[in-house]
Amino acid sequence: MNGTEGPFFYIPMSNATGLVRSPYDYPQYYLVPPWGYACLAAYMFLLILTGFPVNFLTLYVTIEHKKLRSPLNYILLNLAVADLFMVIGGFTTTMWTSLNGYFVFGRMGCNIEGFFATLGGEIALWSLVVLSMERWIVVCKPISNFRFGENHAVMGVAFSWFMAAACAVPPLVGWSRYIPEGMQCSCGIDYYTRAEGFNNESFVIYMFVVHFTCPLTIITFCYGRLVCTVKEAAAQQQESETTQRAEREVTRMVIIMFVAFLACWVPYASVAWYIFTHQGSEFGPVFMTIPAFFAKSSAVYNPVIYICLNKQFRHCMITTLCCGKNPFEEEEGSTTASKTEASSVCSVSPA
């Protein structure tokens, strides 16, 4: 075995030299030099510095501007709340543990950090699923005479929380467990061991099927149908330049959404699956750390992609930041006029 398994931890290094120590009690500088942990702490500080303001601003602007409080925006707010969960409950803890070089908060702290990070990430993931389904239903109209209302929005939010809890809670009650991963400064699901009594294998398979493959399939289907519908609508109005421009904007937005989803989750999921299927094989601590911490950056680019690309929200945000005045009002007004003319296509943009 090329790693060292202990009570509630797994170190990706053999203890043949006697260097390995518990990540709850001792700095792990034998894994990575101190400067590596300092870089990790600086990265987490950057995510906190950007992630908290942009997500908090999203909530504040929506509360400040009544016209943004529509049912279609509920899931976008839910996305911001999920990102704040990750920032407050996960990033702050990881930054402090990185500064110390080990998980200073002990076993209980590992459970708390792992739970909040997993819960926030899963809420965000299932929020994207609900958003893609909402766009598909509203634009492609598979259900005739369907009107997306407040009750549907609340159900979507509740669904995302339920699915997130279905992934984050089991490790707290004995189905799998949270342990320090990578450089031992953040906690996640135990992909590394077949610890007796925790049924890690069944939980990891359940998580990959239900909480990765299913969301990926749903988002791919919904956005694929969305692009086709946009192209069909534009083809029927080829004389309208504004419609063609709206088609390009919407298509670009959808592609960015999908690529961001893949960039966030595929590297982490791929590495986790490799570790799970090659337990005991040799891999370095950075091997899991890089994709795990890259996935955390979703708390920053999620609101940028899903909210700041919304022209109405961007207008309200600029108005709020500029004390009630929008210096770009004329440009926003012309864009709004274009959106009105190309109504059949522009309904694809988040409301």
UniProtKB/Swiss-Prot annotation:
Provide the membrane-side ranges marked Extracellular in the record. Answer: 1-36, 97-110, 174-202, 275-286
Sites annotated Plays an important role in the conformation switch to the active conformation: E113
Alphabetical GO CC annotations of the entry are: membrane; photoreceptor disc membrane; plasma membrane
Positions glycosylated per UniProt: N2, N15, N200
Modified positions (N6-(retinylidene)lysine) are K296
Q: Where is this motif: 'Ionic lock' involved in activated form stabilization?
A: 134-136
Region (Disordered) residue ranges read 330-351
What spans does the record annotate as topological domain Cytoplasmic, numbered to this chain? 62-73, 134-152, 225-252, 309-351
The primary location reported for this protein is: membrane
Keywords tagged on the record: Cell projection, Chromophore, Disulfide bond, G-protein coupled receptor, Glycoprotein, Lipoprotein, Membrane, Palmitate, Phosphoprotein, Photoreceptor protein, Receptor, Retinal protein, Sensory transduction, Transducer, Transmembrane, Transmembrane helix, Vision
Residue ranges annotated as compositionally biased, kind Polar residues, are: 334-351
Tell me which domain of life the UniProt entry assigns to the organism this sequence originates from.
Eukaryota
Transmembrane annotation, as ranges: 37-61, 74-96, 111-133, 153-173, 203-224, 253-274, 287-308
As for what it does, the entry says: Photoreceptor required for image-forming vision at low light intensity. While most salt water fish species use retinal as chromophore, most freshwater fish use 3-dehydroretinal, or a mixture of retinal and 3-dehydroretinal. Light-induced isomerization of 11-cis to all-trans retinal triggers a conformational change that activates signaling via G-proteins. Subsequent receptor phosphorylation mediates displacement of the bound G-protein alpha subunit by arrestin and terminates signaling.
Looking up PANTHER family in the UniProt record yields: OPSIN
Name of protein: Rhodopsin
Native organism: Sardina pilchardus
What gene name is given for the protein in this entry?
rho
